[in-house]
């Protein structure tokens, strides 16, 4: 029974719950970014380049057994049993990764900026525990009546 109790304590800790929420939101954000890249960013980019659909870019490594090359589409090549290198799908993934990494960078940067402003507001200088000897300029404890360096009397 103690194992269940330990697991319950572990599972309801704030950090574990926060991490679970972060993973769920991150997965949803990843799906949004992938859709943004494949449906919004790459089609106009492909149009600018010359009417290229990135998701259908491929290289035939081996022709299919049922139909010889050329194939009109990736789906046709796959249906014919051709072995293909689908570099267009890889490019989609690279673009998604770059956008996701940039979004995470902006998030971390803004959090760090908030931490810096919070830290500067709460940073109150600690009261000094030393004073300076007026004769030799060495650091002396506040309660000292004589300087340990030059033995001068302090006021």
Swiss-Prot record:
It comes from the Bacteria. Keywords: Cell inner membrane, Cell membrane, Ion channel, Ion transport, Membrane, Transmembrane, Transmembrane helix, Transport. It is found in: Cell inner membrane. GO terms for molecular function: mechanosensitive monoatomic ion channel activity. It is a multi-pass membrane protein. PROSITE patterns: MSCL (PS01327). One of its GO terms (cellular component) is plasma membrane. InterPro entries: Mechanosensitive_channel_CS, MS_channel, MSC/AndL, MscL_channel. Coiled coil: none annotated. Its main location: membrane. Homopentamer. Belongs to the MscL family. Channel that opens in response to stretch forces in the membrane lipid bilayer. May participate in the regulation of osmotic pressure changes within the cell. This is Large-conductance mechanosensitive channel.
């Amino acid at each position: 029974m103690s194992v269940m109790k330990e697991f319950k304590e572990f599972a309801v800790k704030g950090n574990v719950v926060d991490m679970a929420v972060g993973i769920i939101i991150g997965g949803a954000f990843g799906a949004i970014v992938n859709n943004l890249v494949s449906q919004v960013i790459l089609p106009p980019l492909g149009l600018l380049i010359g009417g290229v659909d990135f998701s259908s870019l491929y290289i035939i490594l081996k022709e299919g057994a049922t139909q010889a090359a050329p194939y009109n589409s990736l789906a046709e090549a796959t249906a014919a049993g051709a072995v293909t290198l689908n570099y267009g799908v890889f490019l989609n993934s690279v673009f998604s990764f770059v956008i996701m990494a940039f979004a995470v960078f902006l998030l971390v940067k803004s959090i760090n900026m908030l931490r810096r402003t919070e830290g500067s507001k709460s940073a109150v200088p600690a009261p000094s525990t030393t004073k300076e000897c007026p004769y030799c300029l060495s650091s002396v404890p506040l309660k000292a009546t004589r300087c340990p360096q030059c033995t001068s009397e302090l006021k």
